[in-house]
From Swiss-Prot:
InterPro entries: NHR-like_dom_sf (IPR035500), Nucl_hrmn_rcpt_lig-bd (IPR000536), Nuclear_hormone_rcpt_NR2 (IPR050274), Nuclear_hrmn_rcpt (IPR001723), Retinoid-X_rcpt/HNF4 (IPR000003), Znf_hrmn_rcpt (IPR001628), Znf_NHR/GATA (IPR013088). The keyword Zinc applies. It comes from Canis lupus familiaris (Dog). This is Retinoic acid receptor RXR-beta. Residues 95-109, 118-129, 144-153 have a biased composition (Pro residues). Residues 1-24, 37-183, 276-299, 313-336 are annotated as: Disordered. Belongs to the nuclear hormone receptor family. NR2 subfamily. Gene3D superfamilies: Erythroid Transcription Factor GATA-1, subunit A (3.30.50.10), Retinoid X Receptor (1.10.565.10). GO terms for cellular component: cytoplasm; RNA polymerase II transcription regulator complex. Residues 67-82, 276-288 have a biased composition (Basic and acidic residues). The gene is RXRB. Residues 205-270 bind DNA. Composed of three domains: a modulating N-terminal domain, a DNA-binding domain and a C-terminal ligand-binding domain. Residues 271-295 are annotated as: Hinge. Residues 296-529 form the NR LBD domain.
Length: 533
């Protein structure tokens, strides 16, 4: 559209005063129209004169350097929402901009006063306050209140009071009144053990775990481990382990491997020199007395021998009846029946023999019954095995009956019969075991601390240790040329245990079948383990 075809309403609107300061766009239109009419006064002279007068009033003050460029811009140079040049600047008076309280105003949110290619607006004067956001400045300015941490925040806090509460006592990071009590489980804090802890009760043996009787040779131990260590040091004994030198040494298995038990004594801290000093003090007091002279006095071997001889005399009186030593004519042909009858008769004499063993009668009556029920089979097997030393290929029972090897095989008990002959009778014959040594071995079997139901196993263990010491002293005095005799005697104990268990299996089998007559006393012994359980 050319300027000549301009609609005639523009001069009337300008003449009516509608081009006042209501907007940038209208002002621009008025300025252009006034200049256009000045060039063409033939269109409307009156309107041109009024427009010239109005334009002269607005251009009377001297324009600033940046306003000339703004007057010549198009529609894109100004925003219709921008304030007029006559309106005051709110930021120059210190008022905050229209932004949410407490949030910083990003630079992009400031009003743009200049377009592309235009010079930047003049810098605003600095605000009167320290920060244009009074809410944030007031909260940051108070040193006593730290900013609240968001939920789940675990990072460091810059408040000195919080730092003082986190620091441990003694760190010097805050006044004592700011230090809070530490929470349980903080590393570095030492909490005393409760008064009812493990150290408050009775101590246990460091070697086998049994009840300790005090500190012996530098270590809390029971009487059994104390005597074992003392005997090993005084006699300078050497042991060997049949396994990998890692046997279990506890209350029930401490007697199975002497090597591992001795090594554990040394590992827990038992001192060899303490035993030697004790032995030296004993020599100083007793003069020429032996170092182990107290052990035979506590468990004299002569009393053990008397018990063996007394039981043997009663057995011989019974043998002189019908049949004698070879009396197979008046006895049943079944060897199993003969063995069961002989065992039943020997059980009566076994009780009398046990009462003659030193210190056995001093035990509680219930413990005496438990010990007899636990070892009666091994005690009887050891007795008739030693009695059969002079018998060839057979055993001699307490009743005077002789059971041959062939008879045992025909009765179906040949395997266990052969073990008795090879592992017991033959070994006893080769080493010429006497009755004192037999009595000591049987006493060791009798004092079994591993029997179930004992009221005081430690006391039984002490008695067994005394028998060990007495037997060792006897072997060294009676057979000084045989250094390993004591060890050979002890090696018969595992064989007795194994054969005794196997014999019990056979007896239980015969009892279930019912073909073999079993007398009352033997039947009670066979039922004893079930009664104890």
């Amino acid at each position: 559209m050319s300027w000549a075809a301009r609609p005639p309403f523009l001069p009337q609107r300008h003449a009516a005063g509608q081009c006042g300061p209501v907007g940038v766009r209208k002002e621009m239109h008025c300025g252009v129209a006034s200049r256009w009419r000045r060039r063409r006064p033939w269109l409307d002279p009156a309107a041109a004169a009024a427009a010239a007068a109005a334009a002269g009033e607005q251009q009377t003050p001297e324009p600033e350097p940046g306003e000339a460029g703004r007057d010549g811009m198009g529609d894109s140079g100004r925003d219709s929402r921008s304030p007029d040049s006559s309106s005051p600047n709110p930021l120059s008076q210190g008022a905050p901009p229209p932004s949410p309280p407490g949030l910083p105003l990003p630079p992009s949110s400031a009003p743009t006063l200049g377009g592309s290619g235009a010079p930047p607006p003049p810098p605003m004067p600095p605000p009167q306050l320290g920060s244009p956001f009074p809410v944030i400045s007031s909260s940051m300015g108070s040193p006593g209140l730290p900013p609240p941490a968001p939920p789940g925040f675990s990072g460091p806090v810059s408040s000195p009071q919080i730092n003082s509460t986190v620091s441990l006592p003694g760190g010097g990071s805050g006044p004592p009144e700011d230090v809070k009590p530490p929470v349980l489980g903080v590393r570095g804090l030492h909490c005393p053990p409760p008064p009812g802890g493990p150290g408050a009760g009775k101590r246990l043996c460091a070697i086998c775990g049994d009840r300790s009787s005090g500190k012996h040779y530098g270590v809390y131990s029971c009487e059994g481990c104390k005597g074992f260590f003392k005997r090993t040091i005084r006699k300078d004994l050497t042991y060997s382990c049949r396994d990998n030198k890692d046997c279990t040494v506890d209350k029930r298995q401490r007697n199975r491997c002497q090597y591992c038990r001795y090594q554990k004594c040394l590992a827990t801290g038992m001192k060899r020199e303490a035993v030697q000093e004790e032995r030296q003090r004993g020599k100083d007091k007793d003069g020429d007395g032996e170092g182990a002279g107290g052990a035979p006095e506590e468990m004299p071997v002569d009393r053990i021998l008397e018990a063996e001889l007394a039981v043997e005399q009663k057995s011989d009186q019974g043998v002189e009846g019908p049949g004698g030593t070879g009396g197979s004519g008046s006895s049943p042909n079944d060897p199993v029946t003969n063995i069961c009858q002989a065992a039943d008769k020997q059980l009566f004499t076994l009780v009398e023999w046990a009462k003659r063993i030193p210190h056995f009668s001093s035990l509680p009556l219930d413990d005496q019954v438990i010990l007899l029920r636990a070892g009666w089979n091994e005690l009887l097997i050891a007795s008739f095995s030693h009695r059969s030393i002079d018998v060839r290929d057979g055993i001699l029972l307490a009743t005077g009956l002789h059971v041959h090897r062939n008879s045992a095989h025909s009765a179906g008990v040949g395997a266990i019969f052969d073990r008795v002959l090879t592992e017991l009778v033959s070994k006893m014959r080769d080493m010429r075991m006497d009755k004192t040594e037999l009595g000591c071995l049987r006493a060791i079997i009798l004092f079994n601390p591993d029997a179930k139901g004992l009221s005081n196993p430690s006391e039984v263990e002490v008695l067994r240790e005394k028998v060990y010491a007495s037997l060792e002293t006897y072997c060294k005095q009676k057979y000084p040329e045989q250094q390993g005799r004591f060890a050979k005697l002890l090696l018969r104990l595992p064989a007795l245990r194994s054969i005794g268990l196997k014999c019990l299996e056979h007896l239980f089998f015969f009892k279930l079948i019912g073909d073999t007559p079993i007398d009352t006393f033997l039947m009670e012994m066979l039922e004893a383990p079930h009664q104890l359980a």
